[in-house]
Amino acid sequence: LVLSEISYMLKHIRRFTREKRVHTPLSQFHSRSFTKPGPYGVVLIMSPWNYPFLLSLDPLIDAIAAGNTVILKPSAYSPNTSKLIEKMIRECFSPEMVAVVTGGRAENTSLLEEYFDYIFFTGSQNVGREVMKKSSAHLTPVTLELGGKSPCIVDESADLKLAARRIVFGKYLNCGQTCVAPDYICCHSSVKDAFLAEVKKQISLQFGEQPLSSSNYGKIINE
């Protein structure tokens, strides 16, 4: 996914940065109007622990492609991945262009006291509120990618086997450590028992009779 993001940006970056002709207001009659994309400046990227490599590198790729410099703050809950990312960044970029800050809450708090031209945060709603609060002091634009609720609805017309297969896959992917993993199921009472039976079958089919021993079942990084 990271490589595909790099390829996508390389393929489309000229189009993304091209001037676009826009309507000229009457007060500017006889002139021509354009919009021209430009970088924000210094961008802070704060990435989460559930997909620590992907969700650090993807926004970094886009920020660099847009001409920004970046401070990247990976999660303290995935320290080995953070060390690897820091090593890679040091080998590929000068610290004036991209720098990695590791650590936990103290480092996050310190960073949010600084002025940035843009902040991209992926994580929980509680921390997202704090990021928004701190950024407002500098009127810094922010993108918040936060966790939410992802219910699944199974009614009496559903293909129960297909629904069970997809829900089990979605819930157990990365041990449920995915922002859009199903939180709960709203199931019609008339198909509840049959649906639960299909769910149990799918768990066994996808992960065996002892899921915790399955090589397809990952690790819980943060309870």
Describe every region a protein language model picked out.
Residues 1-19, 30:
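Long amphipathic alpha-helix in the N-terminal Rossmann-like dinucleotide-binding domain
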Residues 17-22, 36:
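Acidic catalytic patch
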Residues 21-28, 103, 212-217:
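Short linear capping/connector segments at secondary-structure termini
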Residues 25-162, 200:
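Rossmann-like NAD(P) dinucleotide-binding subdomain of oxidoreductase/dehydrogenase enzymes
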Residues 93, 126-223:
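ALDH superfamily catalytic-core signature
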